[in-house]
Amino acid sequence: MFEFKINQLQKQHPTKLIADGYLEPRPIYTAAAYDKEGNTGTESRTVHLGVDFWLPAQTPVLTLFDAEVVTAVHDTEHKQYGGLVILKHKEDGLIFYTLYGHLSLASATALTVGDILKKGDKIGVLGNAKENGQWAPHLHFQIMLTMLDYTIDFPGVAYPKQLQVWKSICPDPNLLFKNPKLVTEYDASISEIIAFRGKHLGKSLSISYQEPLHIVRGDGAYLI
């Protein structure tokens, strides 16, 4: 269903690239690997640390900088990366890493740790749902300032309580793209909220408050 919606949106805007998601809270990470037991119950990794580019399977992915391959694996777990490549870069004395998730199995594993790539070289191609962790085809792109102790994986989503730590490790990918359309923080005004709800919601869903509540999502019978 989600892939269908993405395809329909792309048909409506054929010249646009569908992308977004840095620090976006998402309730879609349903595999057990995203959960842990905390002091107040189950905690879930929900805050997205990269940008997603929604493109068809087999779309080529190129490196933005000269790079060394430090990870090239097939992450086979459900709702994980599928084909995963992580590159190490050194630009103007700064060492950092870029992560490319949801690649095809064949293209990700065609690389070997230690391989050297030049700017513009092909990293791989996007995988389909059968090989990319059971997601609609897309590229998960992420920047890291350190690999910590990870060698064959790296978190792509964080626990909300740890957000400030992970923001310092994984800066906004839009620092590279500098595209105002990728700015994710948006605080709608009351008038904008009213206009949007009037356009998209039926009158039966109106809520009797003088000022509308700023509802960001629903969970079961609850509005959050």
Give the residues covered by each predicted segment.
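Surface-exposed, glycine-biased beta-strand/turn segments
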Residues: 1-82, 119, 169-180
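Flexible, gly/ser-rich surface segments that form the specificity/activation loops bordering the active-site cleft
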Residues: 70-84, 121-138
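Histidine-centered active-site/metal-ligand motif
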Residues: 48, 89, 102, 138-140
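A residue-level detector for short acidic-glycine micro-motifs
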Residues: 55, 71, 102-105, 128, ...
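Zn2+-dependent peptidoglycan hydrolase active-site motif and core
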Residues: 63-107
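N-terminal glycine-rich, Lys/His-bearing helix-loop that initiates the first secondary-structure elements
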Residues: 181-224
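Generic short beta-strand
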Residues: 85, 141, 221-223
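Acidic, glycine-rich catalytic/binding loops that coordinate metals and/or anionic ligands
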Residues: 109-121, 128-131, 137-181
